[in-house]
Swiss-Prot record:
<feature type="modified residue" description="Phosphoserine">
    <location>
        <position position="276"/>
    </location>
</feature>
<feature type="compositionally biased region" description="Basic and acidic residues">
    <location>
        <begin position="44"/>
        <end position="68"/>
    </location>
</feature>
<dbReference type="GO" id="GO:0006338">
    <property type="term" value="P:chromatin remodeling"/>
</dbReference>
<keyword id="KW-0507">mRNA processing</keyword>
<feature type="modified residue" description="Phosphoserine">
    <location>
        <position position="27"/>
    </location>
</feature>
<dbReference type="InterPro" id="IPR035441">
    <property type="entry name" value="TFIIS/LEDGF_dom_sf"/>
</dbReference>
<feature type="compositionally biased region" description="Acidic residues">
    <location>
        <begin position="377"/>
        <end position="386"/>
    </location>
</feature>
<feature type="modified residue" description="Phosphothreonine">
    <location>
        <position position="435"/>
    </location>
</feature>
<keyword id="KW-0804">Transcription</keyword>
<feature type="modified residue" description="Phosphothreonine">
    <location>
        <position position="725"/>
    </location>
</feature>
<dbReference type="GO" id="GO:0010793">
    <property type="term" value="P:regulation of mRNA export from nucleus"/>
</dbReference>
<feature type="compositionally biased region" description="Basic and acidic residues">
    <location>
        <begin position="85"/>
        <end position="102"/>
    </location>
</feature>
<feature type="compositionally biased region" description="Basic and acidic residues">
    <location>
        <begin position="699"/>
        <end position="710"/>
    </location>
</feature>
<keyword id="KW-0813">Transport</keyword>
<feature type="modified residue" description="Phosphoserine">
    <location>
        <position position="198"/>
    </location>
</feature>
<dbReference type="GO" id="GO:0005654">
    <property type="term" value="C:nucleoplasm"/>
</dbReference>
<dbReference type="GO" id="GO:0005634">
    <property type="term" value="C:nucleus"/>
</dbReference>
Length: 819
């Protein structure tokens, strides 16, 4: 990098045209590269120098640069470098020494002197040193770049000095030529930019000014320092006076001014400067450089392009590769076009700078073409190659002008289209939201109505819901019409009332039947699950899988179906025999075989699916003469029913087993044990209907206690009747408030009295009043005992036992006698 900076690629910071001129005297190829790089960077820097000279004319540079000198003590190093370089330059050129009379003054102020001292050289050295020294404090990267640029510049100035020594006339001549142009640019700040453009910058410079302010605000700290880096660096440098003075410079040097000054129409940049100044000096920069930095995506585009363009735009900080790229004027112009396109896009976002920048770009490219033509005329005398490069750049710039205008127009059109599109989209979205909201409301209403209809179809109307449980109970267990029969008291009324609301849902969930369910519009649609259920029902009586799983047991199905047929036949024969007034013994004779099969665990589900419940109902039902079946039959079948797995409500409903069991439960002549079994069966079968659970494992302790409290019967307190002797309060008697009855007193009883029965139910455990300190202490002490202590205690205990086991020696003297 240093070699490249010293080789002349660093000419960007060292003052574009002087480096070019020196290189003109030195090397033409380097001059081309330096033209483009130094033109781009020093163009911006020269803008600063020219702007700052014009600022000096305006009186701005002093305060602004004084702030630089105040802020830039490190800059003083650079300033000293630029001053030493300027001293060399003073030795090299009297015209430079004349302006160095100013530079020292501006050197103390900071690097305005350097700006004017070496015009484009010391201007960039000064600005870059000034800005770079500022950047050195804040932006080491850019400061290092700017320092390297300063070094490059100063070294460039040194190399320029060497080249000046080689061709002092060329330096002074170029500076003199620059001075006239600078004077022109001083008289005309836009020409100043043009002068800087004509001096250094071919098209790259305006864009370099923009792209540098965007990309290398820091490298261009010379340019973008006054524009943004003053902000970045000046704000970073703790003194935003610098940025603001430099912003005052940047006000005269605004990127718009780069372009504005580059643009022949200085009024546009000035209005824009006025806009940017009225907005804020930062906003001047913000308009171009800052805005393009702030939209750093775009600035990054311009910067990323800039580095690539960068050779054009970032000739200062960009590597020699970029400097090498700069000589490639076509690539540079294209990249600069991209940079300016991105800038124009950024400006299109900033409508203030948009129109001006379009004009600036057009005027820039035009003026740059004129400047390049001027440079070509000057350089034609010096270099034919520079002339070719300038023409090439002019042509590229003319192309880039068209591209920039097109891009600016596109950006405007795009921004307008974006606004209109966004408005239209917002309107459309609003309409869509409204339509969607209305549609969703209608759909919600339809869904609610459909849900209500479905609920009515499933559960019936609300008026029916209250009676649904009763209807289901009546279907399963029959009507309770016989008053003389015993009432079922299996449930507490609270349980039934609390769980009535859940009954319908539980019913629907537990029931397998599709009865009373009107599918409505879903009539044609059957889910896979429903189809599977239908297949299962159709296959239910035919094939069964063994629980072990595996093989089909068709023989078991045959046995089960044959047994059920026999049971139904036996029940029918018994009814016929009963009608004939004959003993009905068919069921009794078949009972052992039925019990044997029904007790087989692997056949229970098969029996249930095959319809054994209806056969059992036939067996438990009373005979035609209203007599109960044999007691043995009732006992065995009730036991088997208890052992059967859970039975679905549909099976209970269709088989009628519930009615038969309820009949037995209520029958006055049924045995107590059978009634208990029947009550348990009814309780178990009806629990799912009322949503009650019989699983107490899932209940917490609090829930169980609450359940016990709720189910606890409310006993009436036993009050003394009027005919009995009023019971005396023993506590009052014992405390002496009332005298104990003596013999002969009314109410005295000369016998021991049985204590009153307590009507208290101890459900809640009484509070434990005994302190637990001792137990806690023991627990803690036990925890504190180590294994060693335990072993020692065991050892001592064993020794004591072993000693006591031996015969005790009695001491005649009475020694070791326990007292």
């Amino acid at each position: 990098m240093d070699s490249e900076y010293y080789s002349g690629d660093q000419s960007d910071d060292g003052g574009a045209t002087p480096v070019q001129d020196e290189r003109d005297s030195g090397s033409d190829g380097e001059d081309d590269v330096n033209e483009q790089h130094s033109g781009s960077d020093t163009g911006s820097v020269e803008r600063h120098s020219e702007n700052e000279t014009s600022d000096r004319e305006d009186g701005l540079p002093k305060g602004h640069h004084v702030t630089d000198s105040e802020n830039d003590e490190p800059l003083n190093l650079n300033a000293s470098d630029s001053e030493s370089e300027e001293l060399h330059r003073q030795k090299d050129s009297d015209s430079e020494s004349e302006e160095r009379a100013e530079p020292p003054a501006s050197d103390s102020e900071n690097e305005d002197v350097n700006q004017h001292g070496s015009d484009s050289e010391s201007e960039e050295t000064r600005k870059l040193p000034g800005s770079d020294s500022e950047n050195e404090e804040l932006l080491n990267g850019h400061a290092s770049d700017s320092e390297n640029e300063d070094v490059g510049k100063h070294p460039a100035s040194d190399s320029e000095i060497e080249e000046l020594q080689k061709s002092p006339a060329s330096d002074s001549e170029t500076e003199d030529a620059l001075k006239p142009q600078i004077s022109d640019s001083e008289s005309e700040e836009p020409p100043r930019h043009q002068a800087s453009d004509s001096e250094n910058e071919e098209p790259p410079k305006p864009r370099m000014s923009d792209s540098e302010s965007e990309e290398l605000p820091k490298p261009q700290v010379s340019d973008s320092e006054s524009e943004e880096p003053p902000r970045h660096q000046a704000s970073d440098s703790e003194n935003e006076e610098l940025p603001k003075p430099r912003i005052s410079d940047s006000e005269s040097e605004d990127p718009p001014r780069h372009q504005a000054s580059d643009s022949e129409n200085e009024e546009l940049p000035k209005p824009r400067i006025s806009d940017s100044e009225s907005e804020d000096p930062p906003r001047n920069q913000a308009s171009d450089s800052e805005n393009e930095e702030l939209p750093k995506p775009r600035v990054s585009d311009s910067e990323s392009e800039g580095p690539q363009k960068g050779p054009a735009s970032d000739s200062e900080t960009e590597d020699a590769s970029r400097h090498k790229q700069k000589p490639e004027s076509d690539d540079d112009s294209d990249r600069e076009n991209k940079g300016e396109d991105t800038e124009m896009q950024n400006d299109s976002f900033h409508s203030d700078s948009h129109m001006d920048r379009k004009k600036f770009h057009s005027s820039d490219s035009e003026e740059e073409e004129h400047k390049k033509q001027k440079m070509d005329s000057d350089e034609d005398e010096k270099e034919g190659e520079e002339e070719k490069v300038a023409k090439r750049k002019a042509a590229v710039l003319s192309d880039s002008e068209d591209e920039e205008k097109a891009s600016a127009k596109k950006s405007r059109v795009v921004s307008d289209a974006d606004d209109s599109d966004s408005d239209a989209v917002s309107d459309k979205s609003g309409k869509r939201e409204k339509t969607i909201a209305s549609d969703s409301e209608e759909e919600a209403g339809k869904e609610l109505s459909d849900k209500k209809n479905e609920e009515k179809d499933l559960f019936g109307s609300d008026s029916e819901s209250g009676n649904e449980e009763e209807n289901l109970i009546a279907d399963i267990f029959g009507e309770s019409g016989d008053e003389e029969e015993e009432e079922f008291t299996g449930f507490n009324q609270e349980d039934l009332e609390e769980e009535k609301g859940e009954t319908q849902v539980k019913e629907a969930e537990d029931s397998d039947s599709d009865d009373n369910i009107k599918r409505g519009k879903h009539m044609d649609f059957l889910s896979d699950f429903e189809m599977m259920l239908q297949r299962k029902k159709s296959m239910s009586g035919k094939r069964r899988r063994n629980r072990d799983g595996g093989t089909f047991i068709s023989d078991a199905d045959d046995v089960v179906s044959a047994m059920i047929v026999k049971m139904n036949e036996a029940a029918e024969e018994d009814r016929q025999l009963n009608n004939q007034k004959k003993p009905a013994l068919k069921k009794l004779t078949l009972l052992p075989a039925v019990v044997m099969h029904l007790k087989k665990q692997d056949l229970k589900e098969t029996f249930i699916d095959s319809g054994v419940m209806s056969a059992i109902k036939e067996w438990l039902s009373p005979l035609p003469d209203r007599s109960l079946p044999a007691l043995k039959i009732r006992e065995e079948l009730l036991k088997i029913l208890q052992e059967l797995p859970s039975v679905s409500q549909e099976t209970l409903k269709h088989s009628g087993i519930g009615r038969a069991v309820m009949y037995l439960y209520k029958h006055p002549k049924e045995s107590r044990s059978n009634k208990d079994m029947a009550g348990k069966l009814i309780n178990e079968w009806s629990r799912p209907i009322f949503g009650l659970t019989s699983n107490y494992k899932g209940m917490t302790r609090e829930e169980r206690e609450q359940r016990d409290l709720e189910q606890m019967p409310q006993r009436r307190r036993m009050n003394s009747t009027g005919g009995q002797t009023p019971r005396r309060d023993l506590e009052k008697v014992l405390t002496g408030e009332e005298k104990a009855l003596r013999p002969g007193d009314p109410g005295f009883c000369a016998r021991a009295r049985v204590p009153m029965p307590s009507n208290k139910d101890y459900v809640v455990r009484p509070k434990w009043n005994v302190e637990m300190e001792s137990s806690r202490f023991q627990a803690t002490s036990k925890k504190g005992i180590s294994r060693l202590d335990k072993q020692m205690r065991k050892f001592t205990d064993i020794r004591k036992k072993s000693r006591s086991a031996h015969a005790v020696k009695i001491s005649i003297e009475g020694n070791k006698m326990p007292l």
